[in-house]
Amino acid sequence: AVFHLMTHAFFKALLFLGAGSVIMGMHHDQDMRNMGGLWKYMPITWLTSLIGSLALIGTPFFSGFYSKDSIIEAVAESHIYGSGFAHFAVMAGVFITAFYSFRMYFLVFHGKERFGQPHDDHGHGHDDHDAHDDHHGLAPGQKPHESPWVVTLPLVMLAIPSVIVGYFAIEPMLFGEFFNGAIFVNLEQHHAMKELAEAFHGPVAMALHSLHSPVLYLALGGVVTAAVFYLWLPQIPAFFARVLAPVKNVLDNKYYLDDFNQAVFAKGARVLGAGLWKGADQGLIDGLVVNGSAKLVGWFSGSVRKVQSGYLYHYAFAMILGLIGLITWILYTHLGSIK
């Protein structure tokens, strides 16, 4: 698994960067149904994407083959509980991976040119991001272009290890001392690894042996099926799209996960934020603590200010009342002390 993680990093990064190069060449259009025939306009991206796809599906002598086939063989030789279902799952994954990888490859780089036309509504999500993306793409009559060297150079640099790194790394990483005890595998308890080590006779022999393996034919079947569906007989997937329209609608809307996230998380966050803003910030903090104390001082000052009328007889009257009150207090306290 660690070996496959390493090889997978190269060709999956290559495919992601290739996708970014295509998006740049298409002026940010990300819908494969608006592409086709890009190989003649983006030759470096086309070739490196082909290399990445071949490595991803486990083509013999490519890096993905050595790590992927090792996992498949290890699962086939395993006798632990559930290994039979695991083997079925990985074999099905071989076909599915080859199918969807070359579906992308054929739709983007081969077939009829579908760019430079007004975009139809393909039923994608209806959030703001998708609405914004609808304004991108090639104008009518405009052609795609290859990406600049700052993009194509990394594509080439990633394509090289996608081809050769598995060939040179399989023996030291799986059967040698590459990890030097950092990863310990008890071969007595893991018979699959022990049998793989005994059957390994070099990377060339391993690749040649796979030429009559069902894994290779499943991968080829996926590639051929993708070619039939999306190059030679596109009416077949169109027929299934009509027959399975409800399923297609769910898939086009990405299982409605974007709508769910928008309605629950995004809208919920906005409602919560508005409540905290109006209730806690404006109501409690600003309204009661900050502005409330200021209003209290203002109210008290306004009340006291009413005493300051500006009329002299009011002040004289207040002084007389004060003097009467002072005399009363003195007499009260003095008489009380005499008693």
Specify the residue positions occupied by each region the protein language model found.
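Aromatic-capped, Gly/Pro-kinked transmembrane alpha-helices
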Residues: 171-218, 228-339
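Alpha-helical transmembrane segments and their membrane-interface junctions
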Residues: 54-70, 158-177, 271
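Hydrophobic, small-residue-rich alpha-helical packing segments that form membrane-like cores
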Residues: 1-80
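Predominantly late transmembrane helices and immediately cytosolic-facing juxtamembrane segments
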Residues: 12, 16, 87-142, 218-241
